[in-house]
């Protein structure tokens, strides 16, 4: 078709432009998008790409636009620079089938009926007579309203672009199902260094592992970025208090010791009441009111010249299908992080739990190669917190999983799944090519060492440990795992009957325990507009006064 140059005379209420091309035509369609938007005209793109015919999305003023399509496909693409081959012309029968499908969707749209082209694209394959519906979510730095929830999973336009099962490695429990999620690369379309992969695990059920991987991908996606329209205040606590702005008192936070701050080369400054920093609005579930919190607790973004006070707290970031579910899961992480850190840094010799039959059956095929220790982590909130230590006898690698759940046995299963799943991460870190790929995403990882002596690569005070992956790399060093593993042997026994229980997995149940000890529950909503459009919520939950497992703690 020829390119429209002028729509100034068009009757916007009764005009719909259908733009058809026999190639991807992204530049032409982008130009047309601007023209139609400027004149308030609705339009429908129709193009061929990879031998398929792609119709949609149906574009109306104030809604989805073609820039969303370009951004989503660019971020999700695995072959960013691949040229699209020129497809053969459609035969008469194929063309009739395509036009009949497009006409049906077009008529539905114009008559106000339900059709997939109002929320995304339809990809038509004349050879197979199939139709694939692809969502086009809003791009977070260009927020817009959406008419209905859309999927966030799609290999061409999604946030999650792929899901695949990771088969069990030799010596790993066959009953543990592990799923890897591939995530769109938002660096291609905006200033957003999001994680490109996430892993989820579950016992027996791959659907649960798949959902765990999606949840992990979504929470990392939202947790790596603050939207440009997010209100951020740059001030000190004292200034905010002076103007009556409710804010979290820095003196309530437990970050680093005075000794660590004095350590030569330590990259962080202590946060004082007169320290200027960025603040974002959160919500206190304890008071029921808004409260401003230091932005660095939940985001890596800083203003020019802003001091560094800490990396974002690794515990507390979670997703859910409701805001309450996200906060509940985040609170479980925060409650697990506190006793975990106190145990890990102080290394008291705690008791161990006997392996119950229900768990022994899950790991029966790993008994020769792995040593499993379950440790209850007592805490002042009397919630079930379990650490699962998994020691690989052959590779001399130790992994640790932690979990809080209303029931101690469920917490143990969750922690054990995490502990075993981490060995997949270790294998990637211990592979020269795998590590090279990870270092492109996580620049603070050290270069590959065939001798695995990574303790020699990091500073003695671990001031250069800036990411949980750095901790995992250190644990590849047989000396690191060996030191801790020795502390896990010959522990006194403790009965399961002695452990606390919560009764139900609800926010109020946890919140009551936390507040009874004088602590406050705060959450910061980090849900991006595209994730919200897919029906998910992401929050970072904080409990001031608890210790979080900071990489350098």
Regions inferred by a protein language model and the residue ranges of each:
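Short, well-ordered coil/turn elements that cap or connect secondary structure elements
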Residues: 12, 38, 60, 367-369, ...
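Short secondary-structure boundary/capping segments within folded domains
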Residues: 9-10, 34, 168-172
């Amino acid at each position: 078709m020829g390119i429209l140059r002028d729509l100034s005379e068009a009757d916007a209420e009764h005009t719909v432009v259908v733009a058809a091309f026999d190639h991807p035509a992204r530049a032409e369609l982008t130009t047309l998008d601007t023209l139609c938007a400027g004149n308030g005209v609705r339009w429908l793109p129709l193009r061929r790409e990879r031998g398929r015919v792609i119709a949609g999305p149906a574009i109306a003023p104030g809604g989805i636009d073609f820039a969303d399509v370009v951004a989503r496909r660019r971020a999700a693409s695995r072959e960013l620079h691949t040229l699209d081959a020129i497809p053969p012309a459609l035969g008469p029968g194929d063309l009739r089938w395509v036009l009949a499908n497009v006409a049906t969707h077009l008529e539905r749209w114009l008559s106000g009926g339900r059709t997939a082209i109002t929320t995304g694209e339809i990809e038509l394959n004349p050879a197979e007579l199939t139709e694939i519906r692809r969502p086009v979510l809003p791009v977070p730095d260009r927020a817009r309203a959406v008419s209905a929830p859309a999927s966030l999973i799609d290999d061409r336009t999604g946030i999650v672009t792929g899901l695949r099962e990771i088969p069990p490695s030799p010596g790993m429990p066959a009953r543990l199902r592990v799923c890897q999620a591939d995530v769109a690369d938002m660096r291609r379309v905006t200033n957003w260094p999001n994680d490109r992969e996430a892993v989820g695990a579950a016992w027996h059920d791959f659907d649960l592992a798949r959902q765990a991987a999606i949840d992990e991908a979504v929470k990392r996606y939202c947790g790596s970025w603050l939207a440009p329209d997010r209100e951020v205040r740059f001030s000190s606590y004292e200034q905010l208090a002076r103007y009556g702005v409710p804010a979290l008192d820095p003196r309530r936070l437990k970050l680093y010791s005075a000794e660590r701050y004095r350590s030569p080369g330590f990259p962080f400054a202590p946060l004082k009441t007169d320290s200027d920093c960025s603040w974002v609005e959160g919500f206190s579930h304890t008071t029921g009111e808004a409260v401003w919190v230091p932005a660095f607790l939940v985001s890596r973004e800083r203003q020019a010249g802003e001091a560094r006070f800490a990396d974002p707290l690794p515990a507390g970031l979670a997703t859910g299908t409701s805001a309450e579910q996200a906060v509940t899961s985040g609170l479980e992480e925060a409650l697990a992080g506190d006793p975990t850190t106190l145990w890990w840094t102080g290394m008291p010799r705690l008791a161990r739990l006997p392996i119950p039959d229900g768990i022994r059956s899950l790991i029966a095929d790993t008994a020769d190669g792995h040593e499993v220790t379950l440790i209850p982590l007592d805490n002042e909130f009397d919630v079930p917190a379990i650490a699962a230590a998994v020691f690989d006898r052959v590779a001399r690698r130790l992994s640790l999983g932690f979990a809080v759940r209303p029931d101690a046995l469920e917490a143990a299963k969750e922690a054990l799944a995490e502990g075993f799943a981490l060995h997949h991460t270790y294998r990637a870190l211990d592979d020269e090519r795998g590590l090279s790929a990870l270092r492109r995403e996580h620049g603070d990882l050290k270069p590959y060492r065939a001798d695995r002596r990574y303790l020699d690569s990091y500073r003695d005070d671990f001031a250069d440990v800036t990411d949980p992956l750095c901790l995992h790399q250190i644990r590849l060093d047989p000396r690191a795992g060996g030191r801790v593993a020795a502390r896990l042997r010959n522990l006194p026994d403790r009965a399961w009957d002695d452990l606390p229980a919560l009764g139900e997995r609800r926010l109020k149940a946890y919140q009551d325990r936390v507040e009874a000890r004088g602590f406050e529950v705060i959450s910061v909503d980090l849900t991006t507009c595209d994730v919200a459009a897919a029906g998910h919520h992401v929050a970072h939950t904080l409990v001031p006064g608890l210790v979080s497992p900071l990489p350098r703690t």
